[in-house]
């Protein structure tokens, strides 16, 4: 009986501590600040440009061109396109379901100043190589190029609609990136666009291979 009572008290103490911490973390300190018109427009331009470039890079390819691999350990156009499409919805889900659900921390804004441009400049740079995590690697999720393209366009439209209309305080919520360190919600959105730009360049590398099928 004594053991059960001690355990129950300990559980109650832990619950109270957790509840107190949660209340402290979620108590608003300032009113939410939505994106500025300039921030929306800048992001939307980035997303539109990278969308158009990606779709142009995969348009009109034959099945041989779509599946050609420059080497056994390198991705085909189809595989790169799948990685872009998977990442599109996954990263947007991270913003909505993880980053924007975390407590606002406007005091961290100084930590991410200047990172908007850094993301847009460094992420597309193919001289810095990185390995995609297992859950973002291509596995043949879409049977055809048309199905993949539709999924990408649907995801991109959802993200752009969100940027266009949201009143979320994206600049006050943060999450660490393994390379860039802490980023705010807006910067994570920019990362989606910059990521597709990086891998569109990879598609062009595949197409430039001397053994790439002529038709």
Predicted regions and their residues:
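Short, helix-capping/interhelical loops that line the mouth of catalytic, cofactor-
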Residues: 23-42, 93-150, 177-178, 210-215
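Hydrophobic packing residues in well-ordered alpha-helices of helical domains and bundles
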Residues: 43, 47, 148-152, 189-192
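Hydrophobic alpha-helical core bundles mediating ligand binding, dimerization, or RNAP-core interactions
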Residues: 51-54, 152, 156-159
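Short, contiguous alpha-helical
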Residues: 68, 72-118, 157, 161-165, ...
